[in-house]
Design a protein with these regions (language model features):
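Long, well-ordered alpha-helical segments
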Residues: 99-104, 132-134
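A short beta-sheet element
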Residues: 34-36, 44-101, 110-113, 117-122
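Non-catalytic DNA-recognition/assembly elements of restriction-modification systems
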Residues: 1-36, 124-137
């Protein structure tokens, strides 16, 4: 099966992430995402798109039951503990998410107490290169 690098098939929007300490968050309606999902709700948003968030640090790396990637849609805020991926044309957002949810990160993450998937390593992760029709079924 032909494979493709994440950096080839996704826009990596990590530079747009902004962490907000709990004491500085203004309560609101927009989800505030971290490595493992919604952490809070805040008054503003920095993204408004169909995206996949992939844990950077503190993720469920190695788990067979808890995913390391999840799909978000619409207005939200993402902190610096999740990589932000926007699929390029020809890559379905659900297929991207499914391909990454339980990705084998053995040998890809580092850190003794808090494992981290660096952006450099994440960019080289491979997913199947399927036609859009095959991604949908």
């Amino acid at each position: 099966m032909e494979m493709m690098l994440l950096e080839e098939c996704c826009e990596i929007l990590d530079s747009m992430r902004i962490p907000i300490t709990a004491s500085n968050r203004k309560e609101g309606i927009y989800p505030y995402y971290g490595a493992n999902g919604i952490q809070d709700h805040v008054a503003d948003y920095i993204f408004d798109d169909e995206l996949v968030l992939l844990a950077e640090d503190g993720g469920n790396f190695g788990s067979k039951t808890r995913p390391i990637a999840y799909r978000v849609s619409g207005k939200c805020w993402v902190n610096n503990h999740a990589h932000v991926l926007k699929p390029k044309e020809g890559l379905n957002v659900d297929f991207l998410c499914y391909s990454l949810m339980f990705y084998n990160t053995e040998g890809l993450v580092n850190g003794a107490t808090r494992q981290k998937l660096t952006q450099t390593t994440m960019r080289k992760m491979l997913i199947p290169n399927l036609s859009i029709e095959n991604q949908l079924y």
